[in-house]
Amino acid sequence: MNSPLPDVALTEVSSALIALDWVGMQGVEVPLTLGEQGATHPVHAYADLQVDLTDPSVKGIHMSRLYRLLDGFAEHQVLTPETLSALLEAMVESHVDCHSSGARITLTFNLLCRRPALVTEGLSGWKSYPVKLEAVWRAGRLCLDVSADITYSSTCPCSAALSRQLLEEAFVARFGRQSFVDPMQVAAWLRENASYATPHSQRSVATVQVRVAEQATEMGLMALIDTVEQALGTPVQTAVKRADEQAFARLNGQNLMYVEDAARKIQQALEGRYPASSVSVRHFESLHPHDAAAQTSSYLS
């Protein structure tokens, strides 16, 4: 005899009649296909998905329903704002018996893409960008925020000035008493001594979050990453030869920046492009055992 399986989420009432903002699952592994320019490979994502539980008398939600919706989405859909909105709406509809009215999803993954070398033709390598998508659906409207971590090099302007001063002093000590200086002699001296003092630089990370416009047809992940890298001027490289390393050294010299400069450069590049944006930058100082950090945000009226 096959007896019905008990479902206490339906048959029992919670002992504490309290509404819950969100209930669901965290860290669900899922492969996703991105509907993005330049995204040629599926990503291994982690999903947090929840619905609200505003009726205090409902003991619990049906997590298996959420899991199956996500699994079907991953198998049959390409991830865009439109399809994500439809998934969230389906999550709410799957819990009509729980009186849920809102749903949210957080997706995290690494976006892997090829980046060309600065100078060497035909040379490129893979670069990974940690990405987070946060989507909330309520009353038929989608609110979607995307964020990405962009790694770059930062060279300290103060350290560069101090290094130049030391080089200047060394140059004067060597050539200061000469009424005429042979350019070739100077060039030879510079080859040996131009690194008499060098400014400190370090790998740095910018975490940039933007609100995706309601009418957007894609998340615009690569467009966001490209905008930030172009604003900074010194994104870390992948495959390099000596000519590329030299070009990178030039870029660092042309784009000296404090952590404040980096945050302002990025925010300026984002202005007017998104309904809202926030920037958090961190320089992993080579001079200190601690990091330098700055944050800024902007909202269109």
Swiss-Prot record:
According to the UniProt entry, its GO molecular function terms are:
GTP cyclohydrolase I activity
Cite the position(s) of the site with description May be catalytically important. C156
Annotated keywords? Hydrolase
Pfam families hit by this protein: GCHY-1 (PF02649)
Query: What's its catalytic activity?
Result: GTP + H2O = 7,8-dihydroneopterin 3'-triphosphate + formate + H(+)
Q: Does the keyword Hydrolase apply?
A: yes
Q: In which pathway does it act?
A: Cofactor biosynthesis; 7,8-dihydroneopterin triphosphate biosynthesis; 7,8-dihydroneopterin triphosphate from GTP: step 1/1
InterPro entries associated with the record: GTP_cyclohydrolase_FolE2 (IPR022838), GTP_cyclohydrolase_FolE2/MptA (IPR003801)
Q: Name one GO biological process term.
A: tetrahydrofolate biosynthetic process
Q: What class of enzyme is it?
A: hydrolase
Does the record's keyword annotation contain RNA-binding? Answer: no
Q: Which domain of life is it from?
A: Bacteria
- The catalytic activity of this protein is classed by the Enzyme Commission as 3.5.4.16
Q: What family is reported?
A: Belongs to the GTP cyclohydrolase IV family.
User: Per its database record, what is this protein's job?
Assistant: Converts GTP to 7,8-dihydroneopterin triphosphate.
Name of the protein this chain belongs to: GTP cyclohydrolase FolE2
Species the sequence originates in: Pseudomonas syringae pv. tomato (strain ATCC BAA-871 / DC3000)
